[in-house]
Amino acid sequence: LKENPNMCAYKAPSLDAREDMMIREVPRVGKEAATKAIKEWGQPMSKITHLIFCTTSGVALPGVDYELIVLLGLDPSVKRYMMYHQGCFAGGTVLRLAKDLAENNKDARVLIVCSENTAVTFRGPSETDMDSLVGQALFADGAAAIIIGSDPVPEVENPLFEIVSTDQKLVPNSHGAIGGLLREVGLTFYLNKSVPDIISQNINDALSKAFDPLGISDYNSIFWIAHPGGPAILDQVEQKVNLKPEKMNATRDVLSNYGNMSSACVFFIMDLMRKKSLEEGLKTTGEGLDWGVLFGFGPGLTIETVVLRSVAI
């Protein structure tokens, strides 16, 4: 920041400096997350067939996905999918895409990497732009990686969760609720104060569509991995669905300790949940429960819904 004082000003031209940072740092931190995931997976990198890379931070050609392949030393025949500027719902999007790839390509192993860095949005405050100030308080840096596949090899691959179904919905009459624009000053964004209301008013429809086919209507009987857009969103969702406060413990812990890391958040929550479930001697990775939901909320306004099934510990 000392070398780039325009980034500390309010809306001073600074895109070149921001992009130079992002193009370098996003794949570097993504590599750290991917290396951890691959080590826990325990299989050779040569078995990775697809890469999905997601970021709202920095745009380049041939892309930060390409840079990650070089950094990791992945096979050049790995099929890559780059997702730029999707925002906070994209943790659900990458799972939806990975599920389709894994189920429709024999022996596929899909490496997902979400790497987010707030240098693209960081700027000084202004009394005339509370959206920016709220964002500076909520958003944070983070990277996460996970490997998705069908038909795990017995006694070799140890699944953590199963993706059962996925869905995406553009909420009617919500245009302009959340959005962003890449400008000379970096990525600017806007957050309508009605966002918590919009999400809470549509959460029951998303839950019904996902769980009615399974005969589940008690949403306290499932585990929750909800993107922590902010405390107000979590509060209103809890109230609307009559959730017990502890259902959002993992989500609130991640928001409190790490902040809103956009697409990477849900994977931090998933990781925390499965580790605490093991530490507490519960019977499954999902707080001892069988079924769960993963929600992504973001620009559009878009809701991603993923039905998960836990794995016995």
Curated annotation (Swiss-Prot):
The keyword Cytoplasm applies. It is found in: Cytoplasm. It is an enzyme of class 2 (transferase). It comes from the Eukaryota. Keywords: Acyltransferase, Cytoplasm, Transferase. It catalyses: 4-coumaroyl-CoA + 3 malonyl-CoA + 3 H(+) = trans-resveratrol + 4 CO2 + 4 CoA. Substrate binds at residues 191, 229-231. One of its GO terms (biological process) is polyketide biosynthetic process. The keyword Cytoplasm applies. Its main location: cytoplasm. Pfam families: Chal_sti_synt_C, Chal_sti_synt_N. One of its GO terms (cellular component) is cytoplasm. GO terms for molecular function: trihydroxystilbene synthase activity. Its EC number is 2.3.1.95. The active site is at 88. PANTHER family: CHALCONE SYNTHASE 7 (PTHR11877:SF62), HYDROXYMETHYLGLUTARYL-COA SYNTHASE (PTHR11877). Homodimer. Belongs to the thiolase-like superfamily. Chalcone/stilbene synthases family. This is Putative stilbene synthase 2. It comes from Arachis hypogaea.
